[in-house]
């Protein structure tokens, strides 16, 4: 390829001016031909010299052109190698982008499913509570209408006839019932207001959970290498503990004879009090050996606190940060709901 194709400036072509014509060469033939023949031979020799100089100049230009061609070929080879490396790097980057997109889609699918399921469950609970509050409100309104009708009927009966004492007692009873109904109505309205506030809080919690899901999705998009980890749910209550307590109670109810028989059997198995003492010594040594790593760990932690108190404070600050508390609340919310519904012990 040439410099014009690559966009490089072409070297200037320098054409040297022809030299002065040489004096005519005098030979015996020119003497025989005379002055006219000598001039003719001189012009021929001058033309030959100019042609030879032009040929030399062309050879020099040819050498320069070949040298420049070699330089351009070398430059082209370097550019081709760099282009191949760039193409390979572009292919690697595209492959990496595809793998990251696959990983992001695989990680986002379960998170989306969990968020949708949680939002659906909360919406269902909110709908049920709204329906219950609406039914309770309708029942109270119907009861209030019935009492109002009874009050009007009793008022008409008292107005058109009846004993004065019975009228007063009936009026007092009706007034007391009316006050009671008004109190019940106010209490029902207060309960409805509290339920509405609770439903609003549930809606805010649902929006907050959706915002947390969106934040996790953004984190997966920005940092695809980093694995978005959802905090694990708290384990159910330990039933083995209850079983151990029951076994302890059963063991405490055994008879004294069984305990003595067990002690006698252990004595016979372990070879008497001396073997039992050796066994206790070995168990004590094992306890000491197990306690030593904990002691070293505590000393190293104390040394770290003495050297750099800011590290422990930063760790504690990260544990009590708003993000950690939000994730903990999001993780423990199903258990709290189970406890509120009476499915877990208080």
From Swiss-Prot:
It is a single-pass membrane protein. Keywords: Coiled coil, Membrane, Transmembrane, Transmembrane helix. Residues 101-120 are annotated as: Disordered. It is found in: Membrane. InterPro entries: TMEM191B/C. The chain crosses the membrane at residues 282-302. The keyword Endoplasmic reticulum does not apply. GO terms for cellular component: membrane. Belongs to the TMEM191 family. This is Transmembrane protein 191B. It comes from Homo sapiens. The gene is TMEM191B.
């Amino acid at each position: 390829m040439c410099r014009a194709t690559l966009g490089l400036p072409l070297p200037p072509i320098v054409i040297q001016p022809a030299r002065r014509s040489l004096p005519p060469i005098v030979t015996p033939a020119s003497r025989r031909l005379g002055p006219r023949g000598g001039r003719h031979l001189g012009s021929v020799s001058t033309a030959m010299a100019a042609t030879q100089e032009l040929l030399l100049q062309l050879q020099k230009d040819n050498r320069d052109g070949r040298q420049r061609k070699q330089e351009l070929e070398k430059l082209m080879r370097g550019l081709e190698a760099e282009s191949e490396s760039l193409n390979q790097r572009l292919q690697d980057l595209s492959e990496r982008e595809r793998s990251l997109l696959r990983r992001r889609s695989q990680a986002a699918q379960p998170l989306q499913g969990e968020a949708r399921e949680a939002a659906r469950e909360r919406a269902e609970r909110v709908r049920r509570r709204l329906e219950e509050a609406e039914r309770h409100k309708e029942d109270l309104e119907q009861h209030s209408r019935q009492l109002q009708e009874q009050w009007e009927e009793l008022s008409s009966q008292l107005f058109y006839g009846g004993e004065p004492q019975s009228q007063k007692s009936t009026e007092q009873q009706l007034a007391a019932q009316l006050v009671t109904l008004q109190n019940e109505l106010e209490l029902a309205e207060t309960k409805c207001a509290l339920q509405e506030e609770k439903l609003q809080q549930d809606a805010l919690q649902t929006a907050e959970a959706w915002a947390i899901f969106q934040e996790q999705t953004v984190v997966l998009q920005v940092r695809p290498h980093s694995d978005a980890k959802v905090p694990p749910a708290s384990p159910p209550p330990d039933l083995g503990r209850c079983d151990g307590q029951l076994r302890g109670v059963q063991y405490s109810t055994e008879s004294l004879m069984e305990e003595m028989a067990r002690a006698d059997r252990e004595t016979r198995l372990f070879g008497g009090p001396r073997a039992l003492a050796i066994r206790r010594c070995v168990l004590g040594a094992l306890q000491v050996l197990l306690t030593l790593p904990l002691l070293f760990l505590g000393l190293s932690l104390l040394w770290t606190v003495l050297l750099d108190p800011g590290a422990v404070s930063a760790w504690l600050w990260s544990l009590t940060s708003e993000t950690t508390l939000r994730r903990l609340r999001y993780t423990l919310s199903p258990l709290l709901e189970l406890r509120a519904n009476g499915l877990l012990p208080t």
